[in-house]
Amino acid sequence: MLSPRRINGLYKAEPKIDYELISVLRERTGVPIVMHGGSGLSAKEYRECIVRGVQKINYYTYADKAALEGAKQFLAEHPETYVFAPVSVVVGRAVEANLDELVQALYEGQLNR
């Protein structure tokens, strides 16, 4: 696995990707590049990483954040909730919506052809 200047979690400053490093490593090694973390990247930045050789993106923080926001909103609207089951449904939908958004961004213009 290669992580070209990436760290996990939310960032205080804008993340910077070394695109040239991704290209060089992919070209010289011939092995697939894994991006460990993609928090804060735009759709354009994700696509540029893919074009340069990233073949796997480990994605968690923003999906986890969407889950938490979904749970908080549900509990605010339903304060009488006393078990987790209904919260888990909302959490699952929030994560699914977040991942759908990511997939649409990554494959913009390529899906539904």
Regions found by a protein language model. Give the residues of each.
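Glycine-rich phosphate-binding active-site loops on the catalytic face of alpha/beta enzymes
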Residues: 4-8, 52-70
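Alpha-helix-loop-beta-strand connector modules within alpha/beta enzyme cores
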Residues: 14-35
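Electropositive phosphate-/nucleotide-binding environments in soluble metabolic enzymes
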Residues: 15-19, 43, 61, 65, ...
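Structural preference for beta-strand elements that scaffold enzyme active sites
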Residues: 1, 32-34, 56
